[in-house]
A protein has these predicted regions:
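N-terminal helical capping/dimerization or prosegment-like subdomains
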Residues: 1-63, 71, 231-235, 249-252, ...
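A structural signal for short hydrophobic beta-strand segments in well-ordered beta-sheet cores
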Residues: 43, 53, 77-79, 216-219
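Metal-dependent amide/peptide-bond hydrolase catalytic core
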Residues: 3, 44, 149, 156, ...
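Short glycine-aspartate micro-motif
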Residues: 61-63, 84, 141-145, 163-165, ...
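Buried hydrophobic packing segments
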Residues: 32, 96-106, 133, 188-191, ...
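Acidic/histidine-rich catalytic neighborhood of metal-dependent amide-processing enzymes
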Residues: 97-163, 368
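Active-site metal-coordination/substrate-binding segment of hydrolases
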Residues: 59-119
Length: 373
């Protein structure tokens, strides 16, 4: 069957065949480096394992960044009609493959602008790949991240995140006299409920995207049924809308923690920020957004849908670090992420390649117009 596939589908099929859970991206990185070379992109693999292909050109510099890693768990790779199934068939090998194919075609046509295509490592982990790009001061005037937005949609916003570990320690005693002791589980949960009440005037509480949301994700505490717990550790994930900066939230959390400690002097409670990310929203009227939206209409015959998602993506990090127009785009239904039913519609995948090609050409045209004003 594969001998009948076009080169773009063959590339994606092989990428899905190459099992690449986080930490095991070296084989697919070497494969993609060779593919990039064959398409006229100068490839290299950096010190953390990112594969980077470049096409020289003048300003503007455009970054296309996808990720090679997937969540763990092998799935059978199979074709069923116009669908390709397998681990990474949604999250997010089609987006990366589309970027490579689009960049290769543009390079062959002597695209005047500089293009950098990155297959990053560790996106599903701690984000080492993207962090290394930033530490090495990668330059871009526009950036597109490859994640499944849907072929006719462009993600322009993600919420920020703040992941906390709350540790509570108290003196223990016999559970037959609980009134004599502070229960570490109760105390930790009391503080957690106070955190859940933190809100800001800038929020739109009726909106899941424009409000602060919180989830208790883990709780560990207690030792024996006859002992009042003296230790409790809980983990929580809070998501922040663009109107609420991480700094603003942490300041309010600090006030809440200070007030709790003043009223609970015999309870030892510590809060650690395990991971955090600022919210990010792109300008819907930016050259990048307009260029890609134009291409969606041109290829699909429908206006692009601009999405705001309650999750958090790599574009948060780059957009808030480099302060350049940044969006997320890629084929696929994100509801299939990390499931056993990951699959991609190959017609949508092929259309996404054309959308990226036409979109980047439009971005260059709009950029040049803006420079003449």
């Amino acid at each position: 069957m594969r001998s009948c596939l076009n080169p773009q589908v063959k590339l994606l099929h092989r990428m899905v065949e190459l099992y690449s859970p986080t930490g095991q991206e070296s084989e697919i990185a070497q494969f993609l480096a060779e593919e990039m070379r064959s398409l006229g992109l100068r490839p290299r693999v950096d010190e953390v394992g990112n594969v980077i292909g470049e096409h020289s050109g003048e300003a503007p510099a455009i970054l296309l960044c996808g990720h090679m890693d997937t969540v763990p768990g092998r799935l059978p790779v199979r074709m069923d009609g116009e669908r390709l199934y397998g681990r990474g068939a949604v999250d997010a090998k089609p987006a990366l493959a589309a970027m490579i194919c689009a960049a290769g075609t543009l390079a062959a046509e002597n695209f005047p602008a500089k293009l950098t295509v990155v297959g990053a490592v560790d996106e599903e982990g701690k984000g080492r790949g993207l962090r290394n790009l930033i530490e090495k001061s990668i330059h871009a005037d526009y950036a597109v991240f490859g994640e499944p937005s849907g072929v006719e949609s462009i993600t322009i916003a993600y919420k920020g995140s703040c992941r906390l570990k709350i540790t509570c320690r108290t003196k223990t005693g016999h559970s037959s006299a609980p009134w004599l002791f502070h229960n570490a589980i109760d105390e930790a949960l009391e503080f957690w409920r106070k955190l859940q009440k933190i809100h800001f005037p800038q929020e739109k509480r009726e909106s899941k995207f424009h409000s602060v949301t919180s989830a208790l994700t883990q709780i560990h505490g207690g030792g024996a049924s006859s002992i009042v717990p003296s230790l409790c550790e809980i983990h929580a994930d809070l998501r922040l809308p663009p109107a609420v900066s991480l700094k603003k939230f942490l300041e309010e959390m600090g006030k809440t923690l200070k007030a709790y400690r003043l009223s609970h002097s015999d309870v030892n409670l510590e809060v650690e920020v395990e991971d955090s990310c600022e919210p990010y929203e792109a300008d819907r009227d930016s050259i990048l957004t307009r260029g890609l939206a134009w291409a969606v209409r041109n290829v699909r015959g429908k206006p692009a849908t601009l999405l705001r998602k309650t999750g958090t993506g790599d574009m948060n990090v780059l957009g808030t670090t480099l302060h350049v127009p940044t969006v997320t785009y890629g084929p696929g239904n994100s509801r299939l992420d990390h499931t056993e039913d990951e699959c991609i519609d190959l017609n949508e995948y092929m259309d996404s390649i054309r959308i990226l090609q036409k979109g980047l050409m439009r971005v260059l045209e709009l950029h040049r117009r803006s420079m003449r004003k």
